[in-house]
From Swiss-Prot:
Residues 217-364 are annotated as: Required for mRNA-binding. The lineage of its organism: Eukaryota, Metazoa, Chordata, Craniata, Vertebrata. Residues 38-50 have a biased composition (Gly residues). It comes from Homo sapiens (Human). Found in a mRNP complex with PABPC1 and YBX3. Found in a mRNP complex with ZAR1 and ZAR1L. Major constituent of messenger ribonucleoprotein particles (mRNPs). Involved in the regulation of the stability and/or translation of germ cell mRNAs. Binds to Y-box consensus promoter element. Binds to full-length mRNA with high affinity in a sequence-independent manner. Binds to short RNA sequences containing the consensus site 5'-UCCAUCA-3' with low affinity and limited sequence specificity. Its binding with maternal mRNAs is necessary for its cytoplasmic retention. Residues 51-63 have a biased composition (Low complexity). It is found in: Cytoplasm; Nucleus. This is Y-box-binding protein 2. Residues 65-74, 351-364 have a biased composition (Polar residues). The modification Phosphothreonine is found at T65, T76.
Length: 364
């Protein structure tokens, strides 16, 4: 009986270990006691021992066989996708000439100098761009240096630079950067204290030294002119009352004290520029004709002027809108003066002249 039990135990152990090793799960084999197969019989005990471990094992390992395709798919990982950095490099530091490059679309082609092959280039592949250009680009007909890698649709260029690693020149259609400096936003500065409180601090006082130390730490605020549209709109604005005080006052010391007040009022409150000086409108100067001597004159009087002077009738005024009556006949006093005995003949020569034009006079 001992030999039959040993044979049954030998046949039971492989049946239990085969499915466990095929499934890849470690199982512990428990030895069958010698008294149990005797109850069911030798043949029955052997069959029970053989079927016992198979029934005790889970059904899942029995279905996972090496030939099952489900096991192969779940067991082997999928291959990783190839990234841009893992592209195989075909050549490095190759010189070529740019065939064409579209700045708007951001791509073009480079013709290799060694193999005369066209290589695709994208704007992201440009490593050293022109610092003056706003966009990355290469110029048409420019000689560049690049590396060739294998892309999805053919050869592609990467690490594009100028010959020797210098920056590329770039396309002439690419916009340039602005020449002005970049605007750096600054926090709003605290408004300085009014200058009125600083004027009495110049004298002796307990807090004068402390106030000077605080004011020296603050940086004086620089006045900035208002914008163009503000100047055009508020040129004739109301004038502050502080600006009129130095003009009305007679003391010369007042303008020196009130000058900083005007500046700070324009900076902090309104920033109104000083009004422009406009001269007062005046009529153009029109010289008036010189008036002839009246009855008070002595030697220069004429005969017709004496007639009305003797009476009560004054001499009529000359019209202003007729300038041709202002012409006077000037006569040299030396050679044309008549001697003493010729004075009685003066009425004969002067009568026909004054009869035609009463306004003309003769000066000696």
């Amino acid at each position: 009986m001992s030999e039959v039990e040993a044979a049954a135990g030998a046949t039971a152990v492989p049946a239990a270990t085969v499915p466990a090793t095929a499934a890849g799960v470690v199982a512990v084999v428990v030895p069958v006691p010698a008294g149990e197969p005797q109850k069911g019989g030798g043949a029955g005990g052997g069959g029970g021992a053989a079927s016992g471990p198979a029934a005790g094992t889970p059904s899942a390992p029995g279905s996972r066989t090496p030939g099952n395709p489900a096991t192969a798919v779940s067991g082997t990982p999928a291959p990783p996708a190839r990234s841009q950095a893992d592209k195989p490099v075909l050549a490095i530091q190759v010189l070529g000439t740019v065939k064409w490059f579209n700045v708007r679309n951001g791509y073009g082609f480079i013709n290799r100098n060694d193999t005369k092959e066209d290589v695709f280039v994208h704007q992201t592949a440009i490593k050293r761009n022109n610092p003056r250009k706003f966009l990355r680009s290469v110029g048409d007909g420019e000689t560049v240096e690049f590396d060739v890698v294998e892309g999805e649709k053919g050869a592609e260029a990467t690490n594009v630079t100028g010959p020797g690693g210098v920056p590329v020149k770039g396309s002439r259609y690419a916009p340039n950067r602005r020449k002005s400096r970049r605007f750096i936003p600054r926090p709003p500065s605290v408004a300085p204290p009014p200058m009125v409180a600083e004027i009495p601090s110049a004298g002796t006082g307990p807090g004068s030294k402390g106030e000077r130390a605080e004011d020296s730490g603050q940086r004086p605020r620089r006045w900035c002119p208002p914008p163009f549209f503000y100047r055009r709109r508020f040129v004739r604005g109301p004038r502050p009352p502080n600006q009129q005080q130095p003009i009305e006052g007679t003391d010369r010391v007042e303008p020196k004290e009130t000058a900083p007040l005007e500046g700070h009022q324009q900076q902090g409150d309104e920033r109104v520029p000083p009004p422009r000086f406009r001269p007062r409108y005046r009529r153009p100067f029109r010289p008036r004709p010189r008036q002839q001597p009246t009855t008070e004159g002595g030697d220069g009087e004429t005969k017709p002027s004496q007639g009305p002077a003797d009476g009560s009738r004054p001499e009529p005024q000359r019209p202003r809108n007729r300038p041709y009556f202002q012409r006077r006949r000037q006569q040299a006093p030396g050679p044309q003066q008549a001697p003493g005995p010729r004075q009685p003949a003066a009425p004969e020569t002067s009568a026909p002249v004054n009869s035609g034009d009463p306004t003309t006079t003769i000066l000696e």
